[in-house]
């Protein structure tokens, strides 16, 4: 607690966050006319305020801004509109100052807000800016909600293990939470001869770190899953516990609801620029010893509101967690276009993901024992309830430019693989389809997380390349640890920092697991 107070005090003393208040006005309120100055009454009033703050510390307030109906697993669209009269983006409530500004309010950004406010409560003024508060373009909307530990990197395995523990005790964390609809079930990752050895090594590492899965030969796969064609398959890895799928939009809603209850401010708007401040007392020196002049830091974000007006928000710390838009935000901060270290860009682009709901009433169609099946072709498929419905997903290599569905995509790219791997679903009927984007790290397809090496007040949490939803829980906690403690306290994610781009040490994930 002492360290926490020191951190908060440091934030509040910094010149670029001086005057930050919970309402963004910077004023202390002054003496109220007619205020009762009787010492006993004043003492009782202060005691009542303290007791109310103690209660709010342990139980978040129920915000009125998160009354959005949450879809079922087979309904991946918001089934209602927000009451715009209750939005927290009324100009009078705009935060002109804050301690932490989070750019991007999807799964990762809202998780960061939740963890910061869960720890700091009123000690930190946290503002989240989201340009699309309907999440029509969010990667969370086109997430299959998978939870799986079948990765090849220890960091990814540990983050998913934490997510499993958190989801199993979600009510303890979220209180009266929106049901996450978590369905415990294993994932089945299939591999041909060329990747069988890698799958073995990954499985061994996963079990050493606390996951539980087993390796199945082609014969054992056929015996266990008669609907599965094992031609071209040498080995399969089946998760035995701590795996399954959940409703990603429900998780996002809980993050927002709880963070708002703890006092976080969610702003509907788009960051269109930054304002900088030159600090003459700090010089930038290159590795070769040349002086590049005074350090120029980030001071304010220029935010365009839905009505077209532009406002500025002065921050002590800023986090870029804008998913597929992160590279554009980084360029506004001169990352990728500046001198020295700033020449190194944030290697994120928007990739398109296709999702299909299909139905088969065939007697031999997969039933309750069907795991989330991951085919070497890149097709992911799982059942959706018990009525013969299935969710089928594939990440395309095309860059995202719109949510339009290519009418020939399923027939050309997905149905042939279904015929091959699960023949009974080859004739399944497509009952719904949708497309969206996700943030793809073109450097090594892994998240970029941590402090930027140039700016002393900028953090990154982006580029998770398709598995950001299941990692959002651990990522939010990790960023909160860096901000409040100055280091990772639980899972050491330092290898995922931006520094690996500068020294050219990629962190390749061999098992791309969707979430």
UniProtKB/Swiss-Prot annotation:
<keyword id="KW-0472">Membrane</keyword>
<feature type="transmembrane region" description="Helical">
    <location>
        <begin position="100"/>
        <end position="116"/>
    </location>
</feature>
<keyword id="KW-1133">Transmembrane helix</keyword>
<dbReference type="Pfam" id="PF01266">
    <property type="entry name" value="DAO"/>
</dbReference>
<keyword id="KW-0496">Mitochondrion</keyword>
<dbReference type="GO" id="GO:0005737">
    <property type="term" value="C:cytoplasm"/>
</dbReference>
<dbReference type="GO" id="GO:0016491">
    <property type="term" value="F:oxidoreductase activity"/>
</dbReference>
<keyword id="KW-0560">Oxidoreductase</keyword>
<protein>
    <recommendedName>
        <fullName>FAD-dependent oxidoreductase domain-containing protein 1 homolog</fullName>
    </recommendedName>
</protein>
<dbReference type="GO" id="GO:0005743">
    <property type="term" value="C:mitochondrial inner membrane"/>
</dbReference>
<dbReference type="InterPro" id="IPR006076">
    <property type="entry name" value="FAD-dep_OxRdtase"/>
</dbReference>
<feature type="region of interest" description="Disordered">
    <location>
        <begin position="18"/>
        <end position="37"/>
    </location>
</feature>
<comment type="function">
    <text>Involved in the assembly of the mitochondrial membrane respiratory chain NADH dehydrogenase (Complex I).</text>
</comment>
<dbReference type="GO" id="GO:0005739">
    <property type="term" value="C:mitochondrion"/>
</dbReference>
<comment type="subunit">
    <text>Associates with mitochondrial complex I assembly intermediates during its biogenesis.</text>
</comment>
<dbReference type="InterPro" id="IPR036188">
    <property type="entry name" value="FAD/NAD-bd_sf"/>
</dbReference>
<keyword id="KW-0999">Mitochondrion inner membrane</keyword>
<dbReference type="GO" id="GO:0032981">
    <property type="term" value="P:mitochondrial respiratory chain complex I assembly"/>
</dbReference>
<keyword id="KW-0812">Transmembrane</keyword>
